[in-house]
């Protein structure tokens, strides 16, 4: 995630023990501040200039090797090591905030990469060489990397990217690149719908779009105004073993999954699945929201995280019968029948804002490092006519409200965490209510918010 800085960046880099790093010029300042705390050999720090390096490779700063210049005399053939790559080998890591704490590195294997890119690109979208995908989503996200880019690769299609999403320039870019397919997240669609209407709204070649998080309220408005025939809404846990795809082009659904899954009853305060007197879980009825569990078997293996203990925490045993295993997605879905489902919400200590997953534990830990804060509880709150949840932090001052410098606190937060994780709202409390087991009553705070 290119927004990560300082301690979070150090943690994420060291988590996978990298042998080398490639740093883009635009991110050089962020990496330079943490370089001494990352165990990468000085001869393996590669630099790429922020320009058309095929014409002008640029000049690497001291301590870096210019990757483009150093590559000029190398063979254009695939390296010998590529002959020994197998389905079960790790392809890359997708970093996720999971449900608590610092980012975890989810292992994405070559076999899963090929399955996911083929299912989205060939089965769901029927991509071909005449197609062009326009993607404004970051490629460190599974939607941008696996869904959009993977679909383009599967269909031998074109792939047009933009460094940062622009609502005002979106359709101009689509026309310029002659795009037939767009990748999205729900927030992106809302920004486009909020733009002033134009006579050119439907003047483009886009016939299909793929992504996640498009809310029912914006679904029909987007489809009608921009004349996009096929909305391929999907659900996939980048650190899990299941995915849903709206292949049949129904409205307001994430579609169906070929994997085995169930929705179970859960505790509304803790978010944990509920077990009956026999120790087994209860499936919810059609139309009722429930916690999504995905069966782990030979058909749907769980690659997990780099840390086996982190993986063990998301695996549930003896769910419906002795010996079965399920992946706990931490997400709430609703079964709408015919094998189709709707996404409802996220559980746990994570909420989604500006297309990013925000870990409340991480926000709390950073705020608690401020000398003027005694207690901090972070959570996501709903705002009318927006996607996801905005951050709110309830705090108790270390001394008094009069001594709390709000401007300095905001500057501190912006320096220590990504901008999307900085809480939009601050609630100051004299004392934080706790449960009988001394846990903060986050559910009550959310309700009051």
Q: What are these model-predicted stretches?
A:
Residues 154, 176-185, 193-268, 301-305:
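Gly/Ser/Thr-rich phosphate-binding loop
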Residues 47, 63, 72-95, 102, ...:
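Conserved pre-ATP/AMP-binding loop-to-beta segment of ANL
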Residues 72-74, 78, 87, 106-128, ...:
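Conserved structural elements of the adenylate-forming
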Residues 114-132, 140-180:
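Conserved AMP-binding/adenylation subdomain of ANL enzymes
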Residues 88-101, 106, 117, 121, ...:
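ATP phosphate-binding P-loop of adenylate-forming
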Residues 4, 10-11, 19-23, 236, ...:
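AMP-binding/adenylate-forming catalytic core of the ANL superfamily
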Residues 1-11, 25-31, 157-176, 358-363:
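ATP-dependent adenylate-forming carboxylate-activation enzymes
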Residues 1-70, 415:
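Structural core segment of the AMP-binding/adenylate-forming
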């Amino acid at each position: 995630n290119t927004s990560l800085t300082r301690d979070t960046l150090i943690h994420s880099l060291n988590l996978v023990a990298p042998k080398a790093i490639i740093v883009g010029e635009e991110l050089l300042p962020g990496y330079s501040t943490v370089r001494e705390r990352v165990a990468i050999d000085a001869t393996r720090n590669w630099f790429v200039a922020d320009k058309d390096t095929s014409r002008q490779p640029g000049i690497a700063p001291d301590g870096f090797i210019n990757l483009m210049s150093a590559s000029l005399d190398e063979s254009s053939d695939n390296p010998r090591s590529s002959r020994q790559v197998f389905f079960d080998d790790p392809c890359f890591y997708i970093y996720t905030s999971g449900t608590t704490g610092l980012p975890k590195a989810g292992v994405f294997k070559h076999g899963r990469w090929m399955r996911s890119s083929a299912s989205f690109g060939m089965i769901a979208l029927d991509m071909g060489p005449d197609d062009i995908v326009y993607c404004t989503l970051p490629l460190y996200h599974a939607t941008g990397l696996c869904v959009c880019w993977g679909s383009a690769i599967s269909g031998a299609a074109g792939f047009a990217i933009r460094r940062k999403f622009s609502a005002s320039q979106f359709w101009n870019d689509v026309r310029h690149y002659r795009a037939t397919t767009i990748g999205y997240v729900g927030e992106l669609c809302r920004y486009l719908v909020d733009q002033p209407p134009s006579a050119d709204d439907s003047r483009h070649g886009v016939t299909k779009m793929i992504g996640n998080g498009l809310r029912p309220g914006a679904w029909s408005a987007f489809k009608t105004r921009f004349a996009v025939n096929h909305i391929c809404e999907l659900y996939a846990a980048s650190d899990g073993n299941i995915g849903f795809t709206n292949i049949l082009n129904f409205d307001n659904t994430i579609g169906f999954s070929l994997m085995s899954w169930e929705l179970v009853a859960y505790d509304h305060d803790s978010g944990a699945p509920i077990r009956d007197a026999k120790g087994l879980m209860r499936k919810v009825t059609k139309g009722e929201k429930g916690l999504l569990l995905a069966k782990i078997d030979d058909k749907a293996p769980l690659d997990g995280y780099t840390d086996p203990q982190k993986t063990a925490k998301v695996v549930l045993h003896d769910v419906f019968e002795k010996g079965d295993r399920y992946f706990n997605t931490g997400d709430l879905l609703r079964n709408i029948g015919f094998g189709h489902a709707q996404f409802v919400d996220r559980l746990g200590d994570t909420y989604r804002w500006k297309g990013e997953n925000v870990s409340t534990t991480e926000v709390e830990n950073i705020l608690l490092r401020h000398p003027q804060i005694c207690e901090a509880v972070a959570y996501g709150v709903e705002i009318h006519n927006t996607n996801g949840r905005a951050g709110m932090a309830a705090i108790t001052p270390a001394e008094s409200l009069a001594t709390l410098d709000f401007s300095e606190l905001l500057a501190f937060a912006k320096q220590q965490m990504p901008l999307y994780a900085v809480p939009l709202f601050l609630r100051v409390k004299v004392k934080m209510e706790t449960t009988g087991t001394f846990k903060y009553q986050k559910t009550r705070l959310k309700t009051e918010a």
